[in-house]
UniProtKB/Swiss-Prot annotation:
Subunit architecture: Part of the 30S ribosomal subunit.
Cofactor binding description: Binds 1 zinc ion per subunit.
Transmembrane annotation, as ranges: none
The organism of origin for this protein: Pyrococcus horikoshii (strain ATCC 700860 / DSM 12428 / JCM 9974 / NBRC 100139 / OT-3)
Homology family: Belongs to the eukaryotic ribosomal protein eS31 family.
Zn finger (C4-type) location: 22-43
Protein name: Small ribosomal subunit protein eS31
Binding residues for Zn(2+): C22, C25, C40, C43
Any single GO CC term annotated in Swiss-Prot or TrEMBL for this entry: ribonucleoprotein complex
Pfam families: Ribosomal_S27
């Protein structure tokens, strides 16, 4: 915990998020990228990649 700074990059003076936010939990809760799916560690919501 406490490493949310790793989920952002600065490009051309703008901040860009690397991961998606969870649609259930809302902004501030990132989803983990597991290669074949996106998963929320807080609520368990999963989106499969095609």
């Amino acid at each position: 915990m406490g490493q949310k700074w790793k989920l952002y990059i600065v490009k051309d003076g703008k901040v860009i998020r690397k991961n998606k936010f969870c649609p259930r939990c809302g902004p501030g809760v990132f989803m983990a990228d597991h290669g074949d799916r996106w998963a929320c560690g807080k609520c368990g919501y999963t989106e499969w990649k095609r």
